[in-house]
Swiss-Prot record:
Keywords: Ribonucleoprotein, Ribosomal protein, RNA-binding, rRNA-binding. The keyword rRNA-binding applies. This is Large ribosomal subunit protein uL14. InterPro entries: Ribosomal_uL14 (IPR000218), Ribosomal_uL14_arc (IPR019971), Ribosomal_uL14_CS (IPR019972), Ribosomal_uL14_sf (IPR036853). Pfam families: Ribosomal_L14. One of its GO terms (cellular component) is cytosolic large ribosomal subunit. Disulfide bonds: none annotated. Binds to 23S rRNA. Forms part of two intersubunit bridges in the 70S ribosome. It comes from Methanococcus aeolicus (strain ATCC BAA-1280 / DSM 17508 / OCM 812 / Nankai-3). GO terms for molecular function: large ribosomal subunit rRNA binding; structural constituent of ribosome.
């Protein structure tokens, strides 16, 4: 895991629903915790592109449902700014399920992956077909 080159807005709080963009059998995920979040009293922990979050599988195969797993956010709808001044946003919020070490559990990632997530997580960039 590496540090960020740009400031990504953390726009996905606890309770946010994400699409699972890999082939692990999960379809919909709900964020239940954000690893490394240090916040203010009564403020919901939130994650953004490249964040490691813990999710509960809400929809998917019977073996995957109701499990709590680590995941990495690879896309978010809320736009964020890159150091060159460009702004980036995607059409959905998506994550990929990973092992505790940070390597993806699935063997493919559907759709584009944000450059910030690919730079930070080497395992995710290996499986990504499109890095945007």
């Amino acid at each position: 895991m590496k540090g960020f080159g740009s400031k990504v807005i953390r726009s996905l709080p606890n309770g946010a629903r994400l699409i699972c963009a890999d082939n692990t059998g999960a379809k919909e995920l709900e964020i239940i915790a954000v690893k490394g979040y240090k916040g203010v009293a009564r403020r919901l922990p939130a994650g953004g592109v490249g964040s490691l979050v813990f999710v509960s599988v809400k929809k998917g195969t019977p073996e995957m449902r109701k499990q709590v797993l680590p995941a990495i956010i690879i896309r978010q709808k809320k736009e964020y700014r890159r150091p060159d001044g460009s702004r980036v946003k995607f059409e959905d919020n998506a994550a990929v399920i990973v092992t505790p070490e940070g390597s993806p559990k699935g063997s493919e990632i559907k759709g584009p992956v944000a450059k910030e997530a690919a730079e930070r997580w080497a395992g995710v960039s290996r499986l990504a077909k499109i890095i945007h």
